[in-house]
């Protein structure tokens, strides 16, 4: 069992801070804990040569390649820039991720 904790979750809006897609933003599609990676919608696109299978035609397909989790930061809609986050505990005991700059919650 993997006990890795990531600062991003599926569905979060993130900004890339390193690599060929630096300063671009996108939505997290999938978390890959074994590779310490995240798939971000429309970013880090690569071309794959796919063989025809069944009724699916073959050809060159563009798809997302994983980015290392250290190369993405949460994007705050209120601040309009990538920010670090911290954990706050609410009165009911629930933990939420909060923007360090403005205090806006990422967990709605």
From Swiss-Prot:
GO terms for biological process: translation. Pfam families: KOW, ribosomal_L24. CDD domains: KOW_RPL26 (cd06089). The keyword rRNA-binding applies. SMART domains: KOW. It comes from the Bacteria. One of its GO terms (molecular function) is structural constituent of ribosome. The keyword Glycoprotein does not apply. Keywords: Ribonucleoprotein, Ribosomal protein, RNA-binding, rRNA-binding. One of its GO terms (cellular component) is ribosome. Part of the 50S ribosomal subunit. Belongs to the universal ribosomal protein uL24 family. NCBIfam families: rplX_bact (TIGR01079). HAMAP family: Ribosomal_uL24_B. One of two assembly initiator proteins, it binds directly to the 5'-end of the 23S rRNA, where it nucleates assembly of the 50S subunit. One of the proteins that surrounds the polypeptide exit tunnel on the outside of the subunit. This is Large ribosomal subunit protein uL24. It comes from Geobacter metallireducens (strain ATCC 53774 / DSM 7210 / GS-15). The lineage of its organism: Bacteria, Pseudomonadati, Thermodesulfobacteriota, Desulfuromonadia, Geobacterales.
